[in-house]
A protein has these predicted regions:
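Nucleotide-activated donor-binding/catalytic signature segment of Leloir-type glycosyltransferases, i.e.
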Residues: 246-264
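Conserved donor-binding/catalytic core segment of Leloir-type glycosyltransferases
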Residues: 192-223, 318
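Short hydrophobic beta-strand element within catalytic cores of glycosyltransferases
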Residues: 301-305
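Short alpha-helical donor nucleotide-sugar binding micro-motif in glycosyltransferases
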Residues: 263-264, 271-276
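Carbohydrate-associated surface elements
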Residues: 159, 179
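Aromatic "clamp/platform" in nucleotide-sugar-dependent glycosyltransferases that forms part
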Residues: 284
Length: 379
């Protein structure tokens, strides 16, 4: 049987390196895996934050950063793609459904007769009445239309498959999870943790400092303890709540046992995974977070907020503890439980996590994505 031909794949996502986040890491890893398999990959993204180079190669992937005229509500860059063309592109893979860059690329692809694959990554939570109404209107007028106009649709979990059906999405949905690549850098202890009493359990948060990731819920949990909970907490990452966290940390009851590390290197992240008693993920909403997969692969138990079926996934895998979303008291209780679990329980969580993570390696995930590409191009 003849092997499928090499493809030129255009990946489109608002955010990309050097922006920090799970979505752009997802896109970058797919791109790198495709390049390793002999395919050509181009990325279109918004130039946010502004980067000196607008066109460059990273990991074998051609990156085109498009400067926006403005950014709507701080999350949707207004970009023009008139000067870009789709000549030679075999398939366009959109990562999201609503942003201007996504919808304009979809329209351009349809005019050019190019097949489009769209991945639905997440269902964002809105709290205000106006926000919920706007979300519903945008979904009906933009998000659902993006999916229906696509030649194939990918969701990360069975939970999102069910959600999109409830939202009125028709047609086939391919369930292909987020993936991860094991950190290859040798572990390096973050300098802020040097000299820490290593006999105390260490719990770690690794992620963007944002409302979505629940760092405020984590701090509420820490402040709920009347005394020393018997463990230390490391918070690694940066984001829109970095300044807020610095202030909150300074006022925290448990300030002395919390280390705010800022953005860490891959080597430091690996050290945290390998030396933490558990990784804490108190998110308000998620797709399938890379930190969850990386932690499990490292044999580190997790405490996962039960959002979009992820708590159930952790419980089914037997790799840690699930807690209700935004429930800081339940989170505090789970953190105490995981920090002081007996060796047998910790070992069981660890081994179950490692076994579960193997099916989420990028090599396996990309093979499934490639199958979708070849299907829509007719190979």
């Amino acid at each position: 049987m003849e092997a499928p031909r090499p493809l030129h794949v255009l990946l489109v996502h608002v955010w990309y390196w050097p922006h920090v986040g799970g979505g752009n890491q997802h896109v970058e890893q797919i791109g790198r895996e495709l390049v390793r398999r002999g395919h050509k990959v181009t990325v279109w993204c918004a130039d946010v934050p502004a980067h000196e180079e607008k066109r460059f190669e990273r990991g074998g992937v051609e990156v085109i950063r498009i400067p926006p005229s403005r950014v709507l509500n701080g999350v949707d860059p207004v970009v023009s793609i008139r000067g870009l063309n789709l000549s030679g592109v075999d398939v366009i893979h959109l990562h999201d459904t609503l942003p201007i860059l996504i919808r304009r690329t979809l329209a351009k692809a349809k005019r050019a007769g190019k097949p489009v694959v769209t991945t639905f990554h997440n269902d964002y939570v809105k709290r205000t009445i106006s926000g919920k109404l706007l979300k519903r209107v945008r979904w009906a007028l933009q998000g659902r239309r993006t999916l229906h106009a696509s030649d194939a649709r990918i969701v990360l979990t069975p939970h999102f498959e069910g959600l999109l059906r409830k939202k009125g999405v028709r047609g086939d949905l391919d369930v292909i999870p987020n993936g991860f690549s094991p950190v290859e850098d040798s572990p390096v202890e973050p300098s802020a943790l040097e000299g820490r009493d290593s006999s105390r359990p260490l719990l770690s948060f690794v992620g963007r400092l944002s409302e979505q990731k629940g760092v405020d819920v984590l701090m509420d949990a820490m402040d709920s303890y009347e005394g020393d909970p018997g463990f230390d907490l490391a918070i690694a990452g940066k984001g829109e709540l970095s300044v807020w966290l610095e202030d909150r940390h300074g006022k925290a009851n448990s300030k002395g046992i919390i280390s705010v590390l800022g953005l860490v290197s891959d080597a430091e992240k690996r050290w945290l995974y390998e030396n933490s008693t558990a990784v804490i993920i108190p998110s308000r909403f998620e797709g399938l977070p890379t930190v969850l997969l990386e932690a499990m692969n490292s044999g580190t138990p997790v405490v996962m907020a039960d959002v979009n079926g992820l708590g159930g996934m952790v419980e089914q895998a037997g790799s840690g503890i699930s807690v209700p979303r935004e429930d800081y008291l339940s989170l505090a209780s789970a953190m105490t439980e995981v920090a002081h679990a007996d060796i047998e329980t910790s070992s069981r969580w660890s081994s179950n996590g490692v076994a579960t993570a193997q099916s989420y390696l990028w090599s396996s995930v990309t093979e499934s994505v490639l199958g979708v590409y070849h299907r829509v191009v007719g190979d």
